[in-house]
């Protein structure tokens, strides 16, 4: 059981990285549909946050089962703060908008990864950093709000995809 959990902990960053490289700036039907729904509906953004939270809860549980320490408690508190949709929206939005903040978050995640007992905090920071890339920016949401002037939905979709990342 513990070996399986450690295998999950080991493979998790690579799975997230593979998903990132498979979906980032790809011009296929799935990506266009994802960008459209994330921009147009608030419920899609909530579902995205729930999926991120579910993966973080799984990783916190895995870290607790293998090495219970204070860093796991800190990671669980950080994950618990994201249960508020306003907080999660604000965090993902700030990470997406401010590239310097995003870079610092990923650098801190790498530092936490190099320290053995801080692995659980690495998972939280790394997941938030990657998830923020796929979260719509304020500019894209403004384009959606100004969509009254655009009569063609395909033109609106092209503008959204152009400014999404």
What feature does the model see in each segment?
Residues 1-10, 57-75, 91-96, 113-127:
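Membrane-helix interface and helix-disruption motif detector
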Residues 140-165:
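Short, highly charged, low-complexity non-transmembrane loops/tails of multi-pass membrane proteins
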Residues 75-86, 127-140:
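Alpha-helical transmembrane segments and their membrane-interface exit regions
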Residues 5-31:
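N-terminal signal-anchor/start-transfer transmembrane helix
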Residues 50-60, 103-115:
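Hydrophobic, membrane-inserted alpha-helices
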Residues 36-46, 88-100:
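Short, amphipathic, aromatic/basic-enriched membrane-interface segments that mark the entry/exit
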Residues 22-35, 83-92:
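C-terminal ends of transmembrane helices
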Residues 34-69:
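Membrane-helix boundary elements
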């Amino acid at each position: 059981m513990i070996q399986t959990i450690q295998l999950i902990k080991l493979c998790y960053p690579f799975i997230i990285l593979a998903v990132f490289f498979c979906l980032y700036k790809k011009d296929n039907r799935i990506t266009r549909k994802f960008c459209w729904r994330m921009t147009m509906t608030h419920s899609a953004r909530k579902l995205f946050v729930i999926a991120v939270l579910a993966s973080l809860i799984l990783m916190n549980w895995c870290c607790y089962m293998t090495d219970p320490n204070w860093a796991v408690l800190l990671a669980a508190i950080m994950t618990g703060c994201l249960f508020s949709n306003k907080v999660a929206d604000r965090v993902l939005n700030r990470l997406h908008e401010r590239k310097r903040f995003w870079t610092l978050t990923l650098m801190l995640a790498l530092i936490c990864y190099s320290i053995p007992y801080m692995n659980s905090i690495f998972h939280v920071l790394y997941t938030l950093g990657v998830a923020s890339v796929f979260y719509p920016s304020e500019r894209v949401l403004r384009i959606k709000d100004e969509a009254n002037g655009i009569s063609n939905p395909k033109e609106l979709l092209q503008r959204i995809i152009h400014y999404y990342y």
